[in-house]
Amino acid sequence: MPIRQLPEILINQIAAGEVVERPASVVKELVENAIDAGATRVDIELEAAGVRLIRIRDNGHGMAAQELPLAVLRHATSKIASLDDLEAVATLGFRGEALPSIASVSRFTLMSRRATDEHGAVLQIEGGTLGEVIPHAHAPGTTVEVRELFYNVPARRKFLRAERTELGHIEEWARSLALAHPDLELRLSHNGKLSRRYKPGDWYSDARLIEILGEDFAHQALRVDHSGAGLRLHGCIVQPHYSRLNADQQYLYVNGRPVRDRSVAHAVKQAYSDVLYQGRHPAYVLFLELDPARVDVNVHPAKHEVRFRDARLIHDFVYRTVQGTLAQTRAGTPPLAVGVGDVEGEGEGARPPGRHAVSFSGRRGGASHVLGSYSTSTAPLMQGVPSVSVADAPAAYAALYAAPPTQVMDAVPQMQTGLPLAAGAGDVPPLGYAIAQLHGIYILAECADGLIVVDMHAAHERIGYERLKRAHDGIGLRTQPLLVPMTLMVAEREADVAECEAETLASLGFEVTRSGPGSLQVRSIPALLSQAEPEMLLRDVLSDLSEHGHTRRVAEARDTLLATMACHGAVRAHRRLSISEMNALLRDMEATERSGQCNHGRPTWARFSLAEIDRWFLRGR
């Protein structure tokens, strides 16, 4: 077959295959155009989940009558005019591909009017054939009608799912849009009935989060807001015990654009690795803001993906911010708002004095509701209440490098006996005062508003683990030279990474030199991990550096070893504790980072409110 120029209609239909995957894709493109046009209200009307009809009305700036034919030409746009504009683009759309692609696979009508015009205009297109622009009564703004989607591409229509499934994709996209644009009023109707309505309002308000993501998410949300290095990350992450079986509540926005990015998702999951139960996924809504010139949004036909100019910096920034937020949670205390000054130094947009975190007034009972309401507390923890001192010196952990793990169990702090805490001495601490031990496994404590139940082994395990990590961090990373250098055969690409990242590997305890196109010579390894298959560990490190530009393999291997040591050193089930020992454990929990979960991600405690206990016995009815 000879080479030939494809007709314009076929070119647009090919482009539609990339841009228009399903009705939700059409809704996305058209509503993003409305937002770029300054709309504050968008109405979405659907029939048969968008297959029969999609109608988008907005109150944006509108278009002049003579611009309507231009709007449906490929690569005609008002948003960029040069390469410099493309590199700094801040609008959601910019290519000028969506309208001609949609019009080529549907019966398409475009109506618009500017506020300064006496009347609007309408343009109809069927199968890529343009009609004439004629005057038409229309309010200021734009209306787009898409009828019989894929009517002329029956093969594509056969691949559409059931009506309920296609509608679900549109509703999920509308939810994502409402999160990104709290100032936008969005109405979604299906088959003549109002399905969703998102009113404009404060993004962090109790009602809006509950409306979009549900009560459980809102009640477990931790505020994130951190700036530095020209970056800002803000939004909400949830407590680890609100993890999900699927990654279905993970929303990431880069400069207001909803995207999927493996590097950022990897950074968030690593930040949760110490507190997340195996096989579970964190939930979050995160907004990353940076100079548009530092991110390339023109890498995916549907603009679902972006490429960062400094992916390693972004990964590290997200990881440290999320990890710092999680680290500030203490058992029994309401979660705090994390601002710029809370995570590794001061940044550009520090939280002003007196600014508090969002307060969620709703409360839920039950063992699953571990942290009660969400609010800011600025009072020092446990003022005037004696606590168990931590006298563990870093020198006590030097044996970690000289002895096998079985000889260093004493490094894990043992349960200490403190003076009984009188219930009348000062304010009641967050986890209250111990009153009994249940079956040698659980501690029962009376708190200000109910009953606290603590898994004593899991709680002590976390306390010991965090102390071991702090002690090890005080010592620093030590290396162990090998008597005989180890030769490691790798792919040439991995050898290139090892050569380029020699300083990074050295900071992790590996002294590695390249000895051939596909071979490395390893002269030293991390001392603490000398028995942890260093060859496999190094391969994993190189894989991470190649894929993400960042690695925590050594830290994770170290933490796994320390977690095992803490587990073996923790108080065992069925050991009877005195009241003072139980109170000592409760005070340590309140002072320990991430003490709401054990080293394996299981919860360490639960609260039952007095109101809930009253309901058990039908009191007050």
UniProtKB/Swiss-Prot annotation:
GO cellular component assignments: mismatch repair complex
One BP annotation, GO: mismatch repair
Classification via Gene3D superfamilies: 3.30.230.10, Histidine kinase-like ATPase, C-terminal domain (3.30.565.10), MutL, C-terminal domain, dimerisation subdomain (3.30.1540.20), MutL, C-terminal domain, regulatory subdomain (3.30.1370.100)
Signal peptide: none
SUPFAM superfamilies the record matches: ATPase domain of HSP90 chaperone/DNA topoisomerase II/histidine kinase, DNA mismatch repair protein MutL, Ribosomal protein S5 domain 2-like
Alphabetical list of InterPro entries matching this protein: DNA_mismatch_repair_CS, DNA_mismatch_repair_MutL, DNA_mismatch_S5_2-like, HATPase_C_sf, MutL/Mlh/PMS, MutL/Mlh/Pms-like, MutL_C, MutL_C_dimsub
Keywords for the protein's UniProt record, in alphabetical order: DNA damage, DNA repair
GO molecular function, one term: ATP hydrolysis activity
Keyword DNA repair (UniProt): yes
Pfam family, one: DNA_mis_repair
Family from the record: Belongs to the DNA mismatch repair MutL/HexB family.
Functional summary from the UniProt entry: This protein is involved in the repair of mismatches in DNA. It is required for dam-dependent methyl-directed DNA mismatch repair. May act as a 'molecular matchmaker', a protein that promotes the formation of a stable complex between two or more DNA-binding proteins in an ATP-dependent manner without itself being part of a final effector complex.
NCBIfam families registered for this protein in UniProt: mutl (TIGR00585), PRK00095.1-2 (NF000949)
PANTHER family reported for this sequence: DNA MISMATCH REPAIR PROTEIN MLH, PMS, MUTL (PTHR10073), DNA MISMATCH REPAIR PROTEIN MLH1 (PTHR10073:SF12)
Protein name per Swiss-Prot or TrEMBL: DNA mismatch repair protein MutL
Species the sequence originates in: Xylella fastidiosa (strain M12)
Gene: mutL
